Amino acid sequence: MTTQFHVVVVGAGYAGVMAANRLLAEHPEVAVTVVNPRPVFVERVRLHQVAAGSGTATHELSDLLHPRVTLHVGTAVRIEPYAVSLADGTVLPCDAVVYAVGSTTGSGAIPGAEKAFSVADLDSATALRDALLEADDHASVVVIGGGLTGLETVTELAQSHPRHTLVLVGDPGAALPVNTQRYIRHRLDELGVQVRSGTRVAHIDDGSVVLDDGSEIPATLVVRTAGFSVPDLARRSGLPVDDDGRLRVRDTLQAVDGSPIVGVGDGMPVVGVGDVMPVVGVGDAVVVDGNDHLRMSCQAAMPLGIHGADTVWQLLQGREPAPLSLGFVTTCISLGRDRGVVQLSARDDTPSRWALRGRLAAPVKEAVVRGTIHTMQLQARGRALPSRRGPDTAAREKAHV
């Protein structure tokens, strides 16, 4: 079948891959070009393993993407009316853009943060792995942040590098139920991780981390897991963004009203769309109106990719897309290779009273992580599983019972 529309997907993370695969599996009249800085897919949920030297996190994109995807290895520098401009000078004409650029750890407001490592991307995790291998025995490694990434990182490092001293600065699992927090503390004690909670980092010096109570922690290496930043592509392109630079999208995932991406002059016409090129945002680098419960996670990114693809298709057909309805199921945390937590949650991501903790949780977490890869491959063949509906949908259903 002759293609009628060309869609450019910027970014090949969880959301971008799912969006590309969904479009091509469902609509043979669409051509898709995926723009990504490297030819591999990076499993961000395994980057703490890369840092610890206990696992890998890459897959060839050719093994995950629909066979009709055109992969362009490069970096987008600007989204123009009906085109995406790349750093190598290439200009990709298109009828719609899926904005899926992802996120990374931000420098934040901590003085000296540039001295710290992170596990937010493959290069950073690899640099930390190399630094750990080169460090002398009994090095002091300070991990900043008691959230999910901080917990997975500090426990993985402690288990893989028992000769080093691991210190966690933060309140471990503070958003989780008390029983789960208690188990996490037990696991940290088991691994010999020192915890400094109830305090914040004032600044990072060469050889130490200074806390806001004036105390210092010796630090051969520092790892920051708190905070985030996103690429400034949306801002540079004149698209609507929030204070953090995330693309602002409506509940359909289309960029909010006021987007200056307008086709004029010789701009490629879009059948049924009028004079505005659809820009649809998915993944970590977007903020969705009316969906404050969405957190940065592959659990959200993959359904966002699917919904974003469906929105693109509806817009290309001149139809009003459906609003997003996305609910959470669980929070999975690895605490080393052989322990973990699977915390069930309500649709709005509020933790429930039920959780699986300890040895039994570790293989469940591993199965979930492997399942994300399988799900992307299934979507390329048109067989992805539906996601859980969101909290607003559940409330409406209850009101009509």
Language-model segments: which ranges?
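FAD-binding core/adjacent interface of flavoenzyme oxidoreductases
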Residues: 2-4, 69-140, 223
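Beta1-alpha1 glycine-rich phosphate/pyrophosphate-binding loop at the start
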Residues: 2-70, 152-178, 401
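Short hydrophobic core segments
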Residues: 10, 92-105, 209, 217-228, ...
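Internal hydrophobic alpha-helix adjacent to the cofactor/substrate pocket in enzyme cavities
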Residues: 20, 291, 299-326
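A Rossmann-like FAD-binding core segment of flavoenzymes
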Residues: 69-80, 84-85, 92, 161-251, ...
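FAD-site-proximal beta/loop scaffold in flavoenzymes
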Residues: 114-137, 216-221, 225-303
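Rossmann-like NAD(P)H-binding beta-loop-alpha module
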Residues: 128-164, 169
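C-terminal auxiliary extensions adjacent to catalytic cores
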Residues: 337-401
